[in-house]
UniProtKB/Swiss-Prot annotation:
Pathway, per record: Amino-acid biosynthesis; L-leucine biosynthesis; L-leucine from 3-methyl-2-oxobutanoate: step 2/4
SUPFAM superfamilies: LeuD/IlvD-like
Record flagged with keyword Transport: no
Entry-linked InterPro entries: 3-IsopropMal_deHydase_ssu, Aconitase/3IPM_dehydase_swvl, AconitaseA/IPMdHydase_ssu_swvl, IPMI_Swivel, LeuD
Listed PANTHER family: 3-ISOPROPYLMALATE DEHYDRATASE SMALL SUBUNIT (PTHR43345:SF5), 3-ISOPROPYLMALATE DEHYDRATASE SMALL SUBUNIT 2-RELATED-RELATED (PTHR43345)
GO BP terms: L-leucine biosynthetic process
Protein name: 3-isopropylmalate dehydratase small subunit
Pfam families: Aconitase_C
Reactions that this protein is recorded to catalyse: (2R,3S)-3-isopropylmalate = (2S)-2-isopropylmalate
E.C. number: 4.2.1.33
Subunit structure, interactors included: Heterodimer of LeuC and LeuD.
Family under the similarity heading: Belongs to the LeuD family. LeuD type 1 subfamily.
């Protein structure tokens, strides 16, 4: 998992409440057995004018010019600004996969659905909760200035705006540690690989029948 320390990026404003996971990545794309390739289909039903299916050449599909991610001023955005209850709906982990593979490193919103919120951390995507008033202010600035950028300093736990304003945010020490070091669940486990191997060797010597094999 990619480490997250300080990130500065263009902000894309998704000015809708209750954006659910089916809007983030529609159900037909969940058939894939891979964890990659979801970025081109993030927000598929809003992003394109036709109906998307797995395996299509998305470069030939007609874009919806009114959708925020298709507007030139927000191209290359890596910070998503959203409204309350972002990521509600079914608990598909494909949703943070799609957002991350689109290019987003962080999402700023007044609130998130719990399961989506947790899935973001597990995949290196930083969900930041600010107050509705703070989010309103950021929406206004994003609309007012082309190429509006935010700097997210995870170590300091603050979002910095170009006008000098700072917006502190909360994160647990464990989640912060994992993101700063690029550890997902597997990475955390592998840090103890030597101890795991030692335990398994000792267990096998004492209880070989559990592995249905003999030690000799």
């Amino acid at each position: 998992m990619e480490k997250f320390n300080v990130h500065t990026g263009v902000v894309a404003p998704l000015d809708r409440e209750n954006v659910d996971t089916d809007a983030i990545i529609p159900k037909q794309f969940l058939k894939s057995i891979k964890r990659t390739g979801f970025g081109p289909n993030a927000f598929d039903e809003w992003r394109y004018l036709d109906h998307g299916e797995p395996g299509q050449d998305n470069s030939k599909r007609p874009l919806n010019p009114d959708f925020v991610l298709n507007q030139p001023r927000y191209q290359g955005a890596s910070v998503l600004l959203a409204r309350k209850n972002f990521g509600c709906g079914s608990s598909r982990e494909h949703a943070p996969w799609a957002l991350q593979q689109y290019g987003f490193r962080a999402i700023v919103a007044p609130s998130f659905a719990d399961i989506f919120f947790n899935n973001c951390y597990k995949n290196g995507l930083l969900p930041i909760v600010l107050t509705e008033q703070q989010v309103d202010h950021l929406f206004n600035d994003t609309y007012a200035f082309n190429g509006y950028q935010l700097t997210i300093d995870l170590d300091a736990q603050v979002v910095r705006a170009p006008d000098g304003r700072e917006y502190p945010f909360e994160i647990t020490a464990f989640r912060k540690y994992c993101l700063l070091n690029g550890f997902d669940d597997i990475g955390l486990t592998l840090r103890h690989a030597d101890k795991i191997r030692q335990f398994e060797a000792e267990r096998l010597a004492k209880q070989p029948w559990l592995d249905n094999r003999l030690v000799g």
